C-alpha cells in the first residue's frame, strides 16, 4: 500500500497547515488487511497534531468540531457506514476557505481557522442521504486495499517495526509533499482511484445510469413536422 503516490502525497499534505489540496482520503477494504496500521503510525509520527475522531460526529455533533482546533489530521479508524444526513461541515472543513464557528460546552462560540485533514478507514465508502453533488464526491480520494491472503500470518509487532523507521517514513511523506506542491496541489490520481470515486458516485445515485442508458432519451432525435 505504501507504494501509492496518491497516499504518499496525501500523507505529506497532512504535515503542513494548508487545505489547498481540498481533498479528504478514504482507504477502503473488506477487513483484516491492516489498513488502520497506517493511522497508528501517523499518530506516532505527528503526535498531538493528529487525533482520532469520527466524520459522522464532526458533521452531526456541534461540539466535535472544536476537537479539530490546532490539529493537522483527524483519523477515523473505523468509519461509520451510515449515510450522512448532511454534508455541510465536512465539505467546509475539507476546503477551509474561511474561519469555522466552534462550540465547546459552557463556552461561547468562537471562530478559528481549521486545517485538519481527514483520513478515514472503513469497509465501505462515505455516502450521503441527500447530497449526490459533484462537490461532495470531488473532495474524496478513495483507495482500495488488496484482500488479505488466506495464508497470511499477522505480525503483532508491525506497528512497532514501522515506528522504528519513522525517519524514513517522514522523508517518504516529504517527498510526496514536494511532488504535490510542484503540481500546484493537484494530487496524482490513478485510473483505479478515479474509478473508485465514479463507482461510489453511481451507486449512490441511480439517476446517473438511468440518464446514460439507451432507450429512455434520444437527445439528438429529430421530430418531423408531421409529428408536431
Region spans (language model):
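Feature primarily recognizes SF3-like P-loop helicase cores of small DNA viruses
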Residues: 1-225
Amino acid at each position: 500500500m505504501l507504494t501509492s503516490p496518491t497516499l504518499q502525497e496525501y500523507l505529506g499534505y497532512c504535515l503542513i497547515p494548508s487545505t489547498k489540496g481540498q481533498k479528504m482520503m478514504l482507504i477502503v477494504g473488506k477487513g483484516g488487511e491492516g489498513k488502520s496500521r497506517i493511522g497508528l503510525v501517523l499518530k506516532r509520527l505527528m503526535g498531538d497534531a493528529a487525533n482520532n475522531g469520527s466524520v459522522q460526529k464532526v458533521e452531526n455533533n456541534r461540539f466535535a468540531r472544536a476537537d479539530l482546533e490546532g490539529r493537522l489530521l483527524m483519523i477515523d479508524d473505523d468509519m461509520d457506514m451510515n449515510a450522512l444526513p448532511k454534508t455541510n461541515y465536512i465539505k467546509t472543513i475539507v476546503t477551509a476557505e474561511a474561519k469555522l464557528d466552534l462550540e465547546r460546552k459552557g463556552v461561547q462560540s468562537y471562530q478559528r481557522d481549521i486545517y485538519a485533514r481527514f483520513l478515514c478507514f472503513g469497509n465501505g465508502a462515505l455516502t450521503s442521504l441527500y447530497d449526490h453533488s459533484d462537490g461532495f464526491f470531488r473532495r474524496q480520494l478513495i483507495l482500495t486495499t488488496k484482500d488479505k491472503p488466506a495464508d497470511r500470518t499477522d505480525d503483532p509487532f508491525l506497528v512497532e517495526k514501522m515506528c522504528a523507521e519513522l525517519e524514513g517514513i517522514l522523508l517518504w511523506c516529504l517527498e510526496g509533499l514536494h511532488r504535490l506542491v510542484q503540481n500546484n496541489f493537484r494530487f496524482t490520481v490513478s485510473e483505479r482511484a478515479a474509478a473508485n470515486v465514479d463507482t461510489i458516485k453511481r451507486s449512490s445515485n441511480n439517476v446517473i445510469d438511468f440518464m446514460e442508458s439507451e432507450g429512455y432519451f434520444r437527445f439528438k432525435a429529430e421530430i418531423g413536422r408531421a409529428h408536431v
